[in-house]
Amino acid sequence: MAKLTKRQKAIREKVQAGKAYSVEEAVALLTELSAPVKFKESIDVSVNLGVDARKSDQVVRSSTVLPNGTGKTVRVAVFTQGANADKAKAAGADIVGMDDLAEEVKKGNLDFDVVIATPDAMRVVGQLGQILGPRGLMPNPKVGTVTADVEAAVNNAKAGQIRYRTDKNGIIHAPLGNVEFSAEHIKQNLEALIADLKKIKPSSAKGVYLKKVTLSSTMGPGLLIDQNSLAV
């Protein structure tokens, strides 16, 4: 049997199996147990939803602008033209174009984290589905990345908008910040996400909707969250 590392021992000693933690307790523990690595460990959430992800009408897919952002610098590419191109640039888009941008994508130049497109640009973007789709970059109106209001879309992306979709097990995965965030900021971000998830509950979903909420860090354990500690 392999020996436990110091960190694994610390996790085993400090994490109480089955305990539901408040967000403040969870963030304090994840920060205490964070690894001595050269990057800031992110703090992420997994939300188990009471949906049947095999049914198309119970797939939960949307976006949320986190009030305190994610702590990450987001590079935004926008497919548009004319006046909208000027608006996108003014809002802070990093790359703006149409056919020229599509050619760069086809060459493998994907130096961006979010792709936004105006409806008229989808004729161009549609050709890039096999490249953008597997990377989770394909614009979609359900998450606000196909829109005529490019200014708002760019602002939201830069402000820390997260996009999510239930996986095959009906679980949402999303970033909430990093170990340098205060517990209050993580809590506010989580509450914003939970509030949005409640708004988009599929009408056909039966029983308990928010089944389990778990916080974790990049290298750390998953901690069950006491939903009664959330103000939503």
From Swiss-Prot:
InterPro entries documented for this protein: Ribosom_uL1_bac-type (IPR005878), Ribosomal_uL1 (IPR002143), Ribosomal_uL1-like (IPR023674), Ribosomal_uL1/biogenesis (IPR028364), Ribosomal_uL1_3-a/b-sand (IPR016095), Ribosomal_uL1_CS (IPR023673)
Gene Ontology terms: biological process: regulation of translation; translation
Domain of life: Bacteria
Keyword set includes Repeat: no
GO CC terms: cytosolic large ribosomal subunit
Entry-linked HAMAP family: Ribosomal_uL1_B (MF_01318_B)
Family membership: Belongs to the universal ribosomal protein uL1 family.
Protein name: Large ribosomal subunit protein uL1
Source organism of this protein record: Hahella chejuensis (strain KCTC 2396)
Gene: rplA
